[in-house]
């Protein structure tokens, strides 16, 4: 296994102004409101940038933000690995989780060389992290018998190695936890109408909610990355629609950032 950091020591990524780029992960259940939230943050400051989840790559659909990018080999094959995972989780969970993490690492690393290089007080917001990939979603699939013992062992070994190679550049300064009930998330799944997600049962969301609570609220979830225990967490209750509460949310985020 990769040797985890022994203390909280974020990576030294800096802007051209000489200011270290703060890296914040936005975490939460499926349909908690992460995409809406990161769009609010993106518009709040020129010194802030967001890295959305690469859902388009998982679905073989180029989003408007990524029209300039060439299709990867896996996209050209025409596979919707997200839909495949939901339809046959025992067959495709290992494949999906491996590719989800790989595409996330690629997107987040690429963002470090983006517009924030010229920012005065740069902050980079990730929509989820490599840690929730493993300790929330992949582990839940393993515990639900959608990954067998061999697949889970290989996934953990692969995840450890990937983080030993690239993880220092992606280490977090803080986490924002968008907290919503599983019932509210299920309702939002129906409302946003993403075809691949329409068969998700409440029980699945409840399991993910429990893991998020253990990790970010109670801080009892154990990981291989010691420094995560010291990363500050801002918890925001998002059960209510927050589309009309932009200013309040942004102020809470600014206050949180000032403490980091």
Curated annotation (Swiss-Prot):
Which EC class is the enzyme in? Answer: transferase
Q: Which residues form the active site?
A: 127
* Residues that bear Phosphoserine: 11, 15, 74
Changes after translation: Phosphorylated and activated in vitro upon phosphorylation at Ser-74 by CSNK1D/CK1.
Q: What is its main location?
A: nucleus
Instruction: Provide the residue positions that the database annotates as binding substrate.
Output: 53, 86, 97, 128, 133, 197
This protein's UniProt keywords? ATP-binding, Kinase, Nucleotide-binding, Nucleus, Phosphoprotein, Transferase
Q: Which domain of life is it from?
A: Eukaryota
Similarity remark: Belongs to the DCK/DGK family.
How does this polypeptide assemble, per the annotation?
A: Homodimer.
How is this protein named in the record? Deoxycytidine kinase
Question: Which species expresses this protein natively?
Answer: Mus musculus
């Amino acid at each position: 296994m990769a040797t985890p950091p022994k203390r909280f020591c974020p990576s030294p990524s800096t802007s051209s102004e000489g200011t270290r780029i703060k890296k914040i992960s936005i975490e939460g259940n499926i349909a908690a409101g992460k995409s809406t939230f990161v769009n609010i943050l993106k518009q709040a400051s020129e010194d802030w940038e967001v890295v959305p989840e690469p859902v388009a790559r998982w679905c073989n659909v180029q989003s408007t933000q990524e029209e300039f990018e060439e299709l990867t080999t896996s996209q050209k094959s025409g596979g919707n690995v997200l839909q495949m995972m939901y339809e046959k989780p025992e067959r495709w969970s290992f494949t999906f989780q491996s590719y989800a993490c790989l595409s996330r690492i690629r997107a987040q690393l690429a963002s470090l060389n983006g517009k924030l290089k010229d920012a005065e007080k740069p902050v980079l917001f990730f929509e989820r992290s490599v840690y929730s990939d493993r300790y929330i979603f992949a582990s839940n699939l393993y515990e639900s018998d959608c990954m067998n013992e061999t697949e889970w062992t290989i996934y953990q070994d692969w995840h450890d190695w990937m983080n030993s190679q690239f993880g220092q550049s992606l280490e977090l300064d803080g986490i924002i936890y968008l907290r919503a009930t599983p019932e509210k998330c299920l309702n939002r799944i129906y409302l946003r109408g993403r075809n691949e997600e329409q068969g998700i049962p409440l029980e699945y969301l409840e399991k993910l909610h429990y893991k998020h609570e253990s990790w970010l609220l109670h801080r009892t979830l154990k990981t291989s990355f010691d420094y995560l225990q010291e990363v500050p967490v801002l918890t925001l209750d998002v059960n209510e629609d927050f589309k009309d509460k932009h200013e309040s949310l942004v102020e809470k985020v600014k206050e949180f950032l000032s403490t980091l």
